């Protein structure tokens, strides 16, 4: 993997992990409403579910590419298109707000959320098909990168959880500017994918 591709990979994964999504909003909302200690099982469920989902994404993406190597190119273009769509959605979105719930979500509910969380499924498929499979098809690399993707995603959830009210206030104050900056960085990622 070239330094340019690594920088695009890290930019994509960090932005995707830190931008608003079901997990991040749930983490923010749970900690804001119930405190960090009572929200640990929510964060644990998300993390375990994230690992399982990333491994499933790796198996699915690898299978498609093994079926026909042209899928790498197709998935790369689809990944670039998805990143551009994500950039547009972020650029036009309003700042995030967390809606508190009555009781904190449990471990199993937050784990189950991962299997219907389109954002992380596309995150895994896009990262693997765009940044890993064009370079190597070694199972150890696919598994390692899947675990790295899950760790980066869990780190994003933890950042939102720890930031709590402070992060929410910052999004309310500077959300538009932040969204435009993140969108521009995602456009950079998409361009690097197509150029690489």
Curated annotation (Swiss-Prot):
Domain of life of the source: Bacteria
Q: How is it placed in the membrane, per its record?
A: Multi-pass membrane protein
What is catalysed by this protein? Answer: O-acetyl-L-serine(in) = O-acetyl-L-serine(out); L-cysteine(in) = L-cysteine(out)
Annotated compartments: Cell inner membrane
Taken from the record's topology, the Periplasmic segments are 63-70, 136-139, 192-196
**What are the GO MF terms of this UniProt record?**
amino acid transmembrane transporter activity
* BP-aspect Gene Ontology terms: cysteine export across plasma membrane
| Name of one Pfam family that matches | LysE
User: Keyword annotations for this protein?
Assistant: Amino-acid transport, Cell inner membrane, Cell membrane, Membrane, Transmembrane, Transmembrane helix, Transport
Where is it mostly found?
membrane
Q: Does the keyword Transport apply?
A: yes
> Which ranges make up the Cytoplasmic topological domains here?
22-41, 92-114, 161-170
GO CC terms in record: plasma membrane
What family classification does the UniProt entry report for this protein? Answer: Belongs to the Rht family.
Q: State the function annotated in the UniProt record.
A: Exporter of O-acetylserine (OAS) and cysteine.
Protein name per UniProt: Cysteine/O-acetylserine efflux protein
Organism of this sequence: Klebsiella pneumoniae subsp. pneumoniae (strain ATCC 700721 / MGH 78578)
């Amino acid at each position: 993997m070239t330094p340019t591709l690594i920088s695009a990979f890290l930019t994509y994964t960090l932005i995707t992990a830190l931008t608003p999504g079901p997990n991040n909003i749930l983490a923010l909302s749970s900690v804001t409403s119930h405190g960090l200690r009572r929200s640990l099982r929510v964060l644990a469920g998300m993390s375990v579910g994230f690992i399982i989902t990333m491994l499933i994404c790796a198996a699915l993406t690898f299978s498609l590419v093994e079926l026909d190597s042209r899928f790498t190119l197709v998935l790369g273009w689809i990944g670039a298109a998805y990143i551009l769509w994500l950039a547009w959605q972020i650029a036009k979105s309003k700042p995030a707000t967390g809606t508190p719930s009555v009781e904190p979500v449990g471990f199993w509910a937050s784990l189950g959320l991962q299997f219907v969380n389109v954002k992380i499924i596309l995150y895994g498929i896009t990262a693997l098909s765009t940044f890993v499979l064009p370079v190597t098809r070694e199972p150890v690399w696919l598994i390692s990168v899947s675990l790295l993707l899950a760790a980066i995603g869990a780190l994003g959830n933890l950042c939102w959880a720890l930031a709590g009210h402070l992060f929410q206030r910052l999004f309310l104050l500077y959300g538009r500017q932040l969204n435009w900056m993140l969108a521009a960085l995602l456009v950079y990622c998409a361009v690097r994918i197509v150029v690489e």
